[in-house]
């Protein structure tokens, strides 16, 4: 017995592919129905400026996919979501403890991949710093979003507070992707950092998601009808409605919005009532749609290349890349 213990403690921990398969089940479940690959398509387009070699690009893509899908596992637990991509969420199949552990495990698997991006110590240190900074930002934003929801009506965020939260929550993974690529890029001819562009893209992405959750049938089939209301989420239209009714002194409507959010209801009729308030009483859905279009136009009308890559000396590349990026933006503005 002592010999076996001695052998055990003098070697690395034993791990098998069978063990790996077991603890990866919640993660593999979410992969059964892939997402729309928006982030991977964006990486491919941005790499037309960054010019990362294929091996590095593949690793960055893998890091992003691991982080994105793992964050969805945690999101679904935090939101008590029944559906993800039209199928039962992982935590309802494998349990909350296993799903949390798997998601956290995949975060560290993603961190482990960073070491494969370079053998140069200063660059590796920079990449790990970027990784840590943006995961911290992501959790800060997610934490605020949850706090506002779970302790409503203690804090009713303003639009500015909401946008700052999204810069952390949604912007974190967008920025992590871009900053890794910029740090690794052998090219410098794009003229300026694309972080402002990616920040704006992240804001558009999140507000559009908030809007479609209340309006889009396809999203209803994948996540459940107006699931943000069941969650009690302070999404962009809800934030506008609460501030609008408060400013206008519409106490009855203000309290009704709060009441429905606090119900955490799955009742379709009650959720439709709140949507009607947002549609007709506070005009919050129209305001949200208009706000998205304003943000999109900041990019589409960017004649000075404040946000888009500056590729004046590479006119063919610039034209094609700008067209592709504007196509992505147009897709995000389809409501």
Curated annotation (Swiss-Prot):
Binds 2 Mg(2+) ions per subunit. The record marks 107 as: Important for determining product chain length. Catalyzes the trans-addition of the 3 molecules of IPP onto DMAPP to form geranylgeranyl pyrophosphate. Required for the membrane attachment of YPT1 and SEC4. May be involved in vesicle trafficking and protein sorting. Its EC number is 2.5.1.-, 2.5.1.1, 2.5.1.29, 2.5.1.10. GO terms for molecular function: (2E,6E)-farnesyl diphosphate synthase activity; dimethylallyltranstransferase activity; geranylgeranyl diphosphate synthase activity; metal ion binding. It is found in: Cytoplasm. It comes from Saccharomyces cerevisiae (strain ATCC 204508 / S288c) (Baker's yeast). Gene3D superfamilies: Farnesyl Diphosphate Synthase (1.10.600.10). Belongs to the FPP/GGPP synthase family. Present with 2840 molecules/cell in log phase SD medium. One of its GO terms (biological process) is geranyl diphosphate biosynthetic process. The lineage of its organism: Eukaryota, Fungi, Dikarya, Ascomycota, Saccharomycotina. Dimethylallyl diphosphate binds at residues 84, 169-170, 206, 213, 223, 233. It holds the Pfam family polyprenyl_synt. Mg(2+) 1 binds at residues 75, 79. Pathway: Isoprenoid biosynthesis; farnesyl diphosphate biosynthesis; farnesyl diphosphate from geranyl diphosphate and isopentenyl diphosphate: step 1/1; Isoprenoid biosynthesis; geranyl diphosphate biosynthesis; geranyl diphosphate from dimethylallyl diphosphate and isopentenyl diphosphate: step 1/1; Isoprenoid biosynthesis; geranylgeranyl diphosphate biosynthesis; geranylgeranyl diphosphate from farnesyl diphosphate and isopentenyl diphosphate: step 1/1. It catalyses: isopentenyl diphosphate + dimethylallyl diphosphate = (2E)-geranyl diphosphate + diphosphate; isopentenyl diphosphate + (2E)-geranyl diphosphate = (2E,6E)-farnesyl diphosphate + diphosphate; isopentenyl diphosphate + (2E,6E)-farnesyl diphosphate = (2E,6E,10E)-geranylgeranyl diphosphate + diphosphate. This is Geranylgeranyl pyrophosphate synthase BTS1. GO terms for cellular component: mitochondrion. Changing residue 139 to A: Reduced affinity for isopentenyl diphosphate (IPP). Its cofactor is Mg(2+). Mg(2+) 2 binds at residues 75, 79. Changing residue 8 to G: Monomer and homodimer. Monomer. InterPro entries: Isoprenoid_synthase_dom_sf, Polyprenyl_synt, Polyprenyl_synt_CS. Keywords: Carotenoid biosynthesis, Cytoplasm, Isoprene biosynthesis, Magnesium, Metal-binding, Protein transport, Transferase, Transport. Isopentenyl diphosphate binds at residues 36, 39, 68, 85. It comes from the Eukaryota.
């Amino acid at each position: 017995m002592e010999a076996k213990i001695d052998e055990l403690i003098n070697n690395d921990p034993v791990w098998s592919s069978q063990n790996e398969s077991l603890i990866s089940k919640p993660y593999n479940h979410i992969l059964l129905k892939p997402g729309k690959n928006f982030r991977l398509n964006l990486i491919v387009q941005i790499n037309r400026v960054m010019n990362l070699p294929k091996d590095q690009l593949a690793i960055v893509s893998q890091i992003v996919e691991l982080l994105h899908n793992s964050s969805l596992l945690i999101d679904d637990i935090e939101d008590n979501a029944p559906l993800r991509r039209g199928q039962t969420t992982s935590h309802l199949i494998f349990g909350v403890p296993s799903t949390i552990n798997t998601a956290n495990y995949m975060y560290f698997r993603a961190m482990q991949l960073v070491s494969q991006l370079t053998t140069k110590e200063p660059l590796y240190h920079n990449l790990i710093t970027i990784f840590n900074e943006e995961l911290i930002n992501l959790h800060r934003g997610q934490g605020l979003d949850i706090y506002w929801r779970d302790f409503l009506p203690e804090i009713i965020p303003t639009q500015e507070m909401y946008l700052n939260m999204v810069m952390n929550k949604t912007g974190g993974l967008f920025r992590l992707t871009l900053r890794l690529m910029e740090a690794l890029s052998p090219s410098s001819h794009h003229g300026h950092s694309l972080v402002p562009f990616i920040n704006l893209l992240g804001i558009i992405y999140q507000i559009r998601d908030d809007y479609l959750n209340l309006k889009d049938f396809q999203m209803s089939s994948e996540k459940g009808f107006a699931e943000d209301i069941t969650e009690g989420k302070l999404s962009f239209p809800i934030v506008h409605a609460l501030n609008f009714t408060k400013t206008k002194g519409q106490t009855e409507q203000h309290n009704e919005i709060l009441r429905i959010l606090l119900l955490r209801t799955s009742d379709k009729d009650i959720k439709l009532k709140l949507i009607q308030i947002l549609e007709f009483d506070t005009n919050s859905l129209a305001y949200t749609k208009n706000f998205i279009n304003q943000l999109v136009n900041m990019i589409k009308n960017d004649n000075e290349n404040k946000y888009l890559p500056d590729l004046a000396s590479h006119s063919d590349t610039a034209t094609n890349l700008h067209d592709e990026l504007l196509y992505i933006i147009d897709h995000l503005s389809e409501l």
